[in-house]
UniProtKB/Swiss-Prot annotation:
Catalyzes the transfer of 4-deoxy-4-formamido-L-arabinose from UDP to undecaprenyl phosphate. The modified arabinose is attached to lipid A and is required for resistance to polymyxin and cationic antimicrobial peptides. One of its GO terms (cellular component) is plasma membrane. InterPro entries: ArnC_tfrase, Glyco_trans_2-like, Glycosyltransferase_2, Nucleotide-diphossugar_trans. This is Undecaprenyl-phosphate 4-deoxy-4-formamido-L-arabinose transferase. The gene is arnC. It catalyses: UDP-4-deoxy-4-formamido-beta-L-arabinose + di-trans,octa-cis-undecaprenyl phosphate = 4-deoxy-4-formamido-alpha-L-arabinopyranosyl di-trans,octa-cis-undecaprenyl phosphate + UDP. Keywords: Antibiotic resistance, Cell inner membrane, Cell membrane, Glycosyltransferase, Lipid A biosynthesis, Lipid biosynthesis, Lipid metabolism, Lipopolysaccharide biosynthesis, Membrane, Transferase, Transmembrane, Transmembrane helix.
Amino acid sequence: MFEIHPVKKVSVVIPVYNEQESLPELIRRTTAACESLGKEYEILLIDDGSSDNSAHMLVEASQAEGSHIVSILLNRNYGQHSAIMAGFSHVTGDLIITLDADLQNPPEEIPRLVAKADEGYDVVGTVRQNRQDSWFRKTASKMINRLIQRTTGKAMGDYGCMLRAYRRHIVDAMLHCHERSTFIPILANIFARRAIEIPVHHAEREFGESKYSFMRLINLMYGLVTCLTTTPLRMLSLLGSIIAIGGFSIAVLLVILRLTFGPQWAAEGVFMLFAVLFTFIGAQFIGMGLLGEYIGRIYTDVRARPRYFVQQVIRPSSKENE
């Protein structure tokens, strides 16, 4: 049996991108939830290159008297997961909770995650109940969840919900991973010995609009497939074998038909030959596109560029920037 260490300090990591309308309420509610824990805590807000007034508001929040807020300002937009990784690199707590800034997942759920982590779990995930998203977002989320479960073999119910708790050793393990394409919930589950999911409330978005457009969801799906598993390459090899066998069978059939019915029939079969040809060409292009995705990610990783660049870090203990 492994010794269960009680949580002493909680770090809440929240990526922020153009959320100036929700920030005051986010800070108030998150601070209140953390105060109710009766433990040490810090709230890390990472500005992911916002074009509105979010960065300035974060700096002011960190410099306020009695603040527990650490503001991390990135020089441009790197994406949600890169921003969270930037926050992970500055946490000091032994339990790290991630939360979205849109308040669709209430900060009031934080004490429940801490209590469950205190039972000895490495990762505490969440499943959104009564989701208040559009039909398209719900459908896309279900498809992505099923895709992840099949390709990774990790049976988690809601990978899209970022309200999660991670023990410090899980976060440290993730920080040692250097791939550019990172999907934090899956990466954490790879290192977790004990993981669990709990149901949480899901509210309507009150401020702003979702940052995930249709194309960003498509890009996310491609990224998940190509960065998490080589199964599509194996499926591509299998598909190529099936097509090759099918093509050979059709060729044999065409020879037999020509010998049976003569050259006149062969002339009338030109369109079928074109159809078969276009089928093979289409399959080749699909395969080349998939290989291109993998090669592109290999190229990106080989360059070894940083995931993000931190421009400033403002801690509540000092008004000086790091």
